[in-house]
Every structure is written in structure tokens, then in C-alpha cells.
Amino acid sequence: MKPVTLTTERLVLRPFEPSDAPAVHAACQEPDIPRWTSVPAPYGVDDAEQFVGTVAPEGWRDDTTYNFAVASRADGSLVGAMGLVRLARLHTPERQAELGYWTAKEHRGRGYTVEAARAVLRWAFRDLGVERLEWHAEAGNEGSRAVARKVGFHMEGTLRAQLVREGIRRDVWIGSLLPSDLPGESGASGSVAPGAPDATPYLPYPG
């Protein structure tokens, strides 16, 4: 897929560029990012250069991951990363993807991650035809869960022993979002609305 750019009131979500490597490297030195994400630790300059120069563009080209650099419209600084991952089921009857993100420490607490997530959700549902979006995080990642809840994800439970990190099995929280979950929010920049009905009929279990 050809990379796209999304714009919100305060942010630009654009493809990563080679010039982003220093900012990505600096952000990923903060311990919470490798602790709660798949970012390796220690995270070197070579890792950042490979991510922005190879991994991110290949994800768009191969339709395996759609990663956005989240940047401030005010000064161009890198706020974080956000994208759709695990896209193997996007072009199957399940029409499913997973939302992932991290935010640089100095930009947390300002609503940027929620604002960016709403733009990506809208794009996923409207333009990509996603019918079920999932959120996964290692159990205990309260910051990620707070963002997921704010954009409307329904918490579905805990996947026991689903993740192996540092040779230890760990639990994973899972949430889901359907197009029909989204309320209308006309006029708000970066809003997801109007919530479209699911394209494939949905028969929820009545029990």
C-alpha cells in the first residue's frame, strides 16, 4: 500500500523518514517503552535507523504493518509512533487489525495519543474496511489501557500466559472496537464519527 498522511488539530501522522532516527532513538531510551512494547533493549542508533529506513517502509510496501510517525504540527517534533499491526487477517473475511502505539515521555499527559488513535481508527474503518480492531497490551500496562478505553475499546479480558518476555510467560489484556461502537462526533478534528455499521452482519451471542 502507498503510505498515507493523516492530520488532526494538533498532529500530523506521516510515514517515518530516515531523518526521524535520532528522535526515535532518543525516545526509546526511556525505560517504559522497551518495558511495555516489542522495542528491543538496549535500543541503539542502528536499531532506530533500521526501523525508520527499512522496517517501517517495508511494512507499508508488504501490507504487514502500517506505521505512522506522530509529529507535532506546531514544531514538527516527534510525539510518538502509532500504527496498525498484525494485518494478515485484514484481507480475509475477518477484516481484522490491531492498533499499537508508544509515546515519547515528554509528550505524555497531553491527549496526543488519544487524538492520534482516533485518526487512525477513522482511517481504518472508513478507508481500509476494517471490521474488528483489536488492542493488546501486557497486563499491567495501565497507560496503554487508559488510551484504549478513551477511544472506545471494549475490554474483553485477559489472555493467560499469552506473551513470552525474557523467558517468562506473561498475561495479556485484550480489547476490541467495532465500527458500530463509535458514536457520532460531527465537526471535531480528528474525531472518528460518524460510526458506520459493520459491513458483515454481526450476530452477538445472547447469553
Residue ranges of predicted features:
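Hydrophobic residues in alpha-helical segments
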Residues: C28, T37, G59-R61
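Short, surface-exposed helix-loop/turn micro-motifs enriched in polar/charged residues
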Residues: V39-P40, D62, H91
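Short loop/turn motifs at secondary-structure junctions and domain boundaries
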Residues: E58-D63, F153
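Short, P/G- and charge-enriched loop/turn segments at secondary-structure junctions
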Residues: M1-K2, V55-E58
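Acyl-donor (CoA/ACP) binding surface of acyl/acetyltransferases
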Residues: M1-P34, N67-G207
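Short helix-to-loop capping/linker segments positioned immediately adjacent to catalytic or ligand/cofactor-binding
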Residues: P57-G59, R108-G109
